[in-house]
Amino acid sequence: MATTVAATKLTSLKAVKKLGFREIRQVRQWTPLQSSMPHFGSRQSFATSTVVKAQATAVEQSTGEAVPKVESPVVVVTGASRGIGKAIALSLGKAGCKVLVNYARSAKEAEEVSKQIEAYGGQAITFGGDVSKEADVEAMMKTAIDAWGTIDVVVNNAGITRDTLLIRMKKSQWDEVIDLNLTGVFLCTQAATKIMMKKRKGRIINIASVVGLIGNIGQANYAAAKAGVIGFSKTAAREGASRNINVNVVCPGFIASDMTAKLGEDMEKKILGTIPLGRYGQPEDVAGLVEFLALSPAASYITGQAFTIDGGIAI
């Protein structure tokens, strides 16, 4: 059963032996994982432990020497109960990570995500907390460390929208979006960086939006927050680079969701007309890119970058 933790009632978890990423240069037996995402050209998915075991066996047979064990990365994913966050948590869980599934209100959905990760053979903790509140963020990071000894990757995905035209926007609508979408990223990145600096390694992926690059009518608050995430992440990448901490941004465009499913035919036609590829992206598309940035040795030299995954909107 997945462990559920709320920020207001933090459950004491038994500490386990401290885990951590191997240095990239040591992971010669850990190749990029095959993804279950169609756009990666593969329909087969393997957990990290399976990949490592198979490769270690091959090396041992050829050299007669044992290959050092690669530990499962510990990942915190915020806003992971549905949509893009859910897809990211499941993708990383399938890849063999130990995943803390954060949610704000959707406890049942978050618990289901954790159960799916465990069904893949992984480990998961469900944590309820508001990432715009410093105390909740500190409790969330402590929960992951108490359970698994470290944090290797943080994916800041939690976010909200409060859409309306600028001339009608209330200050409360502005503040609410900025607090969660920008301040929440600041708090989680700051907390994660303190942990990662001590061990001189880590990866942080912040989910922004193509709206932060090109703007959108009725989303002045959202656009400002997401543009802020991009600039903030570039600065965090510069400050963390000397400690081998990679910070990158993913900027999705229109991604299929419950909201897009409810759009009328005329509105959908108008939206798709703005996308060169002529279709919505899928949450799994975003998850595949995040998995690469979070886990692949090939991403070790990438930092401070903002990747659009938008079907060509921002060309």
UniProtKB/Swiss-Prot annotation:
The catalytic site is made up of: 222 (proton acceptor)
> What keywords tag this UniProt record?
Chloroplast, Fatty acid biosynthesis, Fatty acid metabolism, Lipid biosynthesis, Lipid metabolism, NADP, Oxidoreductase, Plastid, Transit peptide
What is the residue range of the signal peptide feature?
none
Protein's cellular compartments: Plastid, Chloroplast; Plastid
Q: Name one GO biological process term.
A: fatty acid biosynthetic process
Could you say which enzyme class this protein belongs to? oxidoreductase
Tell me the protein's name.
3-oxoacyl-[acyl-carrier-protein] reductase 3, chloroplastic
